[in-house]
Amino acid sequence: MEQGQDTPWTQSTEHTNIQKRGSGQQTQRLEHPNSTRLMDHYLRIMSPVGMHKQIVYWKQWLSLKNPTQGSLKTRVLKQWKLFNKQEWIN
């Protein structure tokens, strides 16, 4: 294989994000992002409301010691519905 040739792995994990700041452009290219870098990037590009919902979700995930898939789904859905209800009231 030639050096510099894209493999299916690099094609699927490369992520290019272009953000405009002021009059210039900044290009950020993440190759083989680990989960922390990917999550940081995701939180940077989300809206404030979306970011708050994601933080609430991750706090719930981390607060569970040994979650089963069913218990996790039930708990997160309950909190999500409650949060959305409060958002409509406010």
Curated annotation (Swiss-Prot):
Region annotation (Mitochondrial targeting sequence) ranges: 65-87
Gene that encodes the chain: PB1
High-level lineage: Viruses, Riboviria, Orthornavirae, Negarnaviricota, Polyploviricotina
Family to which the UniProt record says this protein belongs: Belongs to the influenza viruses PB1-F2 family.
Subunit structure and binding partners: Oligomer. Interacts with human SLC25A6/ANT3 and VDAC1. Interacts with host MAVS.
Residue ranges of the region described as Disordered: 1-34
A GO cellular-component term linked to this record: host cell cytosol
Keywords associated with the record: Apoptosis, Host cytoplasm, Host membrane, Host mitochondrion, Host mitochondrion inner membrane, Host nucleus, Host-virus interaction, Inhibition of host innate immune response by virus, Inhibition of host MAVS by virus, Inhibition of host RLR pathway by virus, Membrane, Modulation of host cell apoptosis by virus, Viral immunoevasion
Further information: Is not encoded in all strains, and seems to be dispensable for replication.
GO biological process: symbiont-mediated perturbation of host apoptosis; symbiont-mediated suppression of host cytoplasmic pattern recognition receptor signaling pathway via inhibition of MAVS activity
Biased composition (Polar residues): 1-28
Protein name: Protein PB1-F2
Listed InterPro entries: Flu_proapoptotic_PB1-F2 (IPR021045)
Signal sequence coordinates: none
Location of this chain's protein in the cell: Host mitochondrion inner membrane; Host nucleus; Host cytoplasm, Host cytosol
Site label Low pathogenicity, positions: N66
Role, per record: Plays an important role in promoting lung pathology in both primary viral infection and secondary bacterial infection. Promotes alteration of mitochondrial morphology, dissipation of mitochondrial membrane potential, and cell death. Alternatively, inhibits the production of interferon in the infected cell at the level of host mitochondrial antiviral signaling MAVS. Its level of expression differs greatly depending on which cell type is infected, in a manner that is independent of the levels of expression of other viral proteins. Monocytic cells are more affected than epithelial cells.
Organism: Influenza A virus (strain A/Teal/China/2978.1/2002 H5N1 genotype W)
